[in-house]
């Protein structure tokens, strides 16, 4: 038998989900203006966006309709009008808007390296990381990503694809996440690292 508290929590969750779905539906109805110097091509639910900062291609499930009308991208649910289609089209609209922004102005993530002897440098299409291990770490830089290294300890990851920029940033950080005692490692600029006191020997 459900308690009053459980019933209340279920009602709150349902209300929250309904509110989020309505918000995404409102977002989905908003056209996406195509800026100057940006080209959008749509073929069989695959969207290609090109601009000054590069190009991004993504394929979406055929539960939404994507069209260009009056130099704007319009996203709408497919004719079956399923609950999934109605829930998805706001998300698809947000992703495409992010693609347009990415090729127009780009996305960036900044990292910093802390630790004695820890540093990074570029070797062609590879990032060379010295992070206190017995061997350097060589990471291939994917197409569509630019990495800049300043003074060996400051890195900037740039690209038109927001998801790819985030993935590359996360990979670099994963090689030596900031440890909580001395704080050394690779961290995203602005990241808060919870520090711990080291154990003392009696």
Provide a role label for each language-model segment:
Residues 17-170, 174-202:
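N-terminal intrinsically disordered, cationic/polar leader segments
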Residues 3-23:
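Short, Lys/Arg-enriched N-terminal segments with co-localized hydrophobic residues
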């Amino acid at each position: 038998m459900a308690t009053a508290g459980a019933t209340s929590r279920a009602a709150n969750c349902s209300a929250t989900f309904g509110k989020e779905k309505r918000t995404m539906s409102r977002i989905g109805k908003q056209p996406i203006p195509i800026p100057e110097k940006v080209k959008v091509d749509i073929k069989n639910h695959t969207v290609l966006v090109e601009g000054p900062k590069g190009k991004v291609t993504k394929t979406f499930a055929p539960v939404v309709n994507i069209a260009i009308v009056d130099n704007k991208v319009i996203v709408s649910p497919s004719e079956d009008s399923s609950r999934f289609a109605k829930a998805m089209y706001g998300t698809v609209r947000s992703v495409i808007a992010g693609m347009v922004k990415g090729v127009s102005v780009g996305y960036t993530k900044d990292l910093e390296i802390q630790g004695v002897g820890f540093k990074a440098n570029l070797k062609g299409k590879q990032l060379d990381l010295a992070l206190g291990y017995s061997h350097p770490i060589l990471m291939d830089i994917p197409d569509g990503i630019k990495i800049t290294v300043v003074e060996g300890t400051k890195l900037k990851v740039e690209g038109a694809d927001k998801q790819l920029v985030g993935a590359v940033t996360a990979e670099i950080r994963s090689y030596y996440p900031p440890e909580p005692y001395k704080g050394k490692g690779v961290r995203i600029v602005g990241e808060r690292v919870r520090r711990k006191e080291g154990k003392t020997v009696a």
